[in-house]
């Protein structure tokens, strides 16, 4: 009786063990590292240090799902075997777009190495890539602006290195960009095959490609390159010849002999089901470790504002005098301390109320964080509620539980505060204090917060207008003032270091005019450069965009029209979640998700309520009504 119990899986998880063991062995063999830990969990697939995360299988996995899972494992194993993290880091170009393309092409390189050496790996990767692009709906893309350039370059590189056509679900993306890429970088592309086994030489060619495509600046011979004696100049050897042959045999067995892995897995599925769930959006990253981009995911274009101004008939006379500046650079430490003390004194009576609202928000977030668990797992916290099972049946294994991860753990929030003259007095002091306390609250909950401000450097046009006047007053100059975008707190800066920076908003003469559309684009681009899965942008303003210099030489709705176009672009074509709070100003006519408050003292409640609503589970938010105008 006991022997039968041992022979038959006793839990649903055990049914998948033969498949998981076989796949884990293949991954370690390809990676050439027996210490690699392979985990299957309801988390976004990824690789952190020595740990490779793969998605937990569904209850009844199909052959397609098994092949996709193998493809994900092969992709990450090849990355670990063939990519030297330090070389990748030091050779990486400047700029978010250039880095994204550079990383995508490196992933194409390592996958090409595996495909050329092992037929089983090639087949698994093909299935995984087909699934990846199908999920991203690339087949529906019709315009070049919607097609990610990085993915197109990676597809073209893969085609050149392996001779394989791109997956059918991604063919349109490459077709839209092929003429541009080959027209700009055909000569560089021809050198890729000869350097495929040398990461550093390959990276040099890719940087030349990016320069030819005008995505990255030209590099000198020694720019960003590691010393020769420290780098790997020999061919990448992801494993020994014996390992290579063994891995080939194992991978070939995956596809050619269903009786090995597929059949074993299928037979086990018939005997028992496995716990499974959809892959979550969360990507828990260990700080300080290299975390590769998830191979089974694709990112849509991160720059929805490429050529945007031209399309909406918005011009800028000159950007020569614009500035993006950290708040501490605008005044010295002593003045910042004095301004912060003044801010605290002005709002001493308000801090208690705002603090209570912030604590309420924190309790709601922490309740979400702690109330959701997964049960009947093979590892995690011991589930004391299931211990009676062992008394009833000693053959039952111990049961463990694990806390589920909620969406807000991998989230960044940007608070964009209008620093125009009309905010002077009560509105700006309340906004500064609310931003301060919310940043502290969200930081406690593991949510990163960025606080930005926008204004102009001068009244009545500043140096831009002077240049325009000196140039003979050309017609239709467009925006005619010097922008000042202020970083009060970056997303990665701890609250305690940035606290005093908010006092700058109290400085006499800081608040001038407001050009909202370009400020939104700026804040949006900063968010898009972040690695977090979820990005939220909250605008706090008290009126429509106003700049006397610009409006005196352009149509009266020039800035407002641009703002509306920017908002529509973010709301319809960007993954960033945009919401706005208007102080005494109806912002609901601009933003889909917006609330208007009558008095500045209502700001704290509005901010905490709207953020709390955003962080509610999707199922709870689905039935809730759209934000309504308040006040």
Curated annotation (Swiss-Prot):
Concerning CDD domains, the annotation shows: vWA_norD_type
What's a GO biological-process term for it? cobalamin biosynthetic process
User: Which NCBIfam families does this one have?
Assistant: CobT
Composition skew (Acidic residues), residue ranges: 222-235, 243-294
Where is this protein localized, as stated in its record? Cytoplasm
Q: Where is the VWFA domain?
A: 412-631
Q: Name one GO molecular function term.
A: cobaltochelatase activity
- Root EC class: ligase
Please give the pathway this protein is involved in.
Cofactor biosynthesis; adenosylcobalamin biosynthesis; cob(II)yrinate a,c-diamide from precorrin-2 (aerobic route): step 10/10
**Which chemical reaction does it catalyze?**
hydrogenobyrinate a,c-diamide + Co(2+) + ATP + H2O = cob(II)yrinate a,c diamide + ADP + phosphate + 5 H(+)
Subunit composition and interactions = Heterotrimer of CobN, CobS and CobT.
Q: Write out the entry's keywords from A to Z.
A: ATP-binding, Cobalamin biosynthesis, Cytoplasm, Ligase, Nucleotide-binding, Porphyrin biosynthesis
Record InterPro entries: CobT, CobT_VWA_dom, NorD/CobT, VWF_A, vWFA_dom_sf
The job of this chain, per UniProt, is described as: Catalyzes cobalt insertion in the corrin ring.
Q: What is this protein called?
A: Aerobic cobaltochelatase subunit CobT
The family database entries (PANTHER family) matched by this protein are listed as:
NORD PROTEIN
The gene name on file is cobT
Q: Where is this region: Disordered?
A: 218-306
Q: Which organism is it from?
A: Sinorhizobium sp
Q: Under the cellular component aspect of Gene Ontology, which terms does the record hold?
A: cytoplasm
Q: Which Pfam families match?
A: CobT, CobT_C
Q: Which domain of life is it from?
A: Bacteria
Q: What is its EC number?
A: 6.6.1.2
């Amino acid at each position: 009786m006991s022997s039968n119990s041992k022979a038959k899986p006793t839990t649903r998880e055990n049914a998948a063990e033969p498949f998981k063991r076989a796949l884990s062995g293949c991954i370690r063999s390809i990676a050439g590292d027996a210490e690699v830990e392979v985990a299957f969990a309801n988390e976004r697939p990824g690789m952190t240090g020595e740990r490779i995360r793969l998605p937990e299988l569904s209850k009844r996995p199909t052959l397609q799902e098994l092949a996709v899972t193998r493809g994900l494992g092969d992709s990450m194993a090849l990355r670990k075997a063939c990519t030297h993290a330090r070389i990748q880091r030091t050779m990486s170009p400047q700029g978010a777009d250039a880095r994204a393309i550079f990383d995508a092409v490196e992933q194409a390189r390592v996958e090409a190495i595996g495909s050329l050496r092992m037929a089983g790996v090639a087949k698994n990767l093909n299935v995984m890539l087909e699934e990846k692009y199908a999920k991203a709906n690339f087949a529906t893309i019709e315009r070049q602006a919607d097609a990610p350039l990085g993915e197109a370059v990676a597809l073209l590189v893969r085609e050149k290195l392996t001779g394989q056509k791109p997956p059918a679900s991604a063919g349109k993306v490459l077709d839209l960009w092929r003429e541009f890429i080959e027209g700009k970088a055909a000569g560089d592309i021809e050198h890729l095959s000869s350097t495929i086994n040398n990461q550093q030489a390959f990276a040099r060619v890719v940087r030349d490609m990016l320069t030819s495509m005008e995505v990255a600046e030209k590099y000198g011979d020694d720019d960003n390159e590691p010393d020769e004696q420290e780098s790997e100049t020999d061919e990448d050897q992801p494993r020994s010849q014996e390992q290579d042959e063994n891995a080939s045999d194992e991978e070939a067995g995956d596809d050619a002999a269903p009786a090995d892995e597929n059949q074993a897995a299928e037979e086990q599925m018939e005997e028992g089901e496995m716990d499974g769930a959809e892959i979550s959006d969360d990507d828990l990253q260990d700080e300080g470790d290299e975390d590769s981009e998830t191979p089974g995911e694709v990112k849509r274009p991160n720059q929805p504002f490429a050529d945007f101004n031209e399309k909406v008939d918005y011009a800028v006379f000159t950007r020569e005098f614009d500035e993006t500046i950290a708040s501490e650079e605008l005044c010295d430490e002593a003045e910042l301390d004095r301004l912060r003390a003044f801010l605290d004194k002005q709002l001493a009576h308000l801090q208690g109320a705002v603090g209570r609202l912030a604590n309420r928000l924190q309790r709601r977030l922490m309740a979400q964080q702690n109330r959701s668990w997964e049960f009947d797992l093979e590892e995690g916290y011991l589930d004391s509620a299931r211990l009676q099972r062992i008394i009833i049946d000693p053959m039952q294994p111990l049961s463990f539980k694990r806390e589920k991860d909620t969406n807000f753990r991998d989230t960044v929030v940007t608070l964009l505060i209008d620093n125009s003259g009309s905010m002077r007095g009560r509105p700006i002091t309340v906004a500064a204090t609310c931003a301060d306390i919310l940043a502290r609250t969200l930081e406690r909950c593991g949510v990163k917060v960025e606080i930005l401000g926008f204004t102009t450097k001068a009244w009545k046009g500043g140096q831009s207008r002077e240049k325009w006047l000196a140039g003979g007053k050309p017609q239709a100059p467009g925006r005619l003032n010097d922008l000042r975008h202020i970083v009060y707190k970056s997303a990665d800066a701890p609250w305690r270091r940035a606290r005093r920076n908010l006092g700058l908003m109290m400085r006499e003469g800081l608040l001038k005019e407001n050009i909202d559309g370009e400020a939104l684009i700026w804040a949006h681009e900063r968010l898009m450069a972040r690695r977090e899965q979820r990005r939220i942008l909250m605008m706090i303003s008290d009126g429509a965009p106003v700049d006397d210099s610009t409006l005196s030489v352009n149509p009266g709705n020039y800035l407002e029209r641009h703002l509306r176009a920017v908002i529509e672009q973010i709301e319809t074509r960007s993954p960033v979640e945009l919401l706005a709070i208007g102080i005494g100003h109806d912002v609901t006519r601009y933003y889909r998700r917006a609330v208007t408050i009558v008095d500045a003292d209502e700001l704290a409640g509005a901010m905490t309520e709207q953020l709390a609503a955003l962080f509610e589970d999707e199922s709870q938010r689905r039935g809730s009504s759209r934000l309504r105008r308040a006040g």
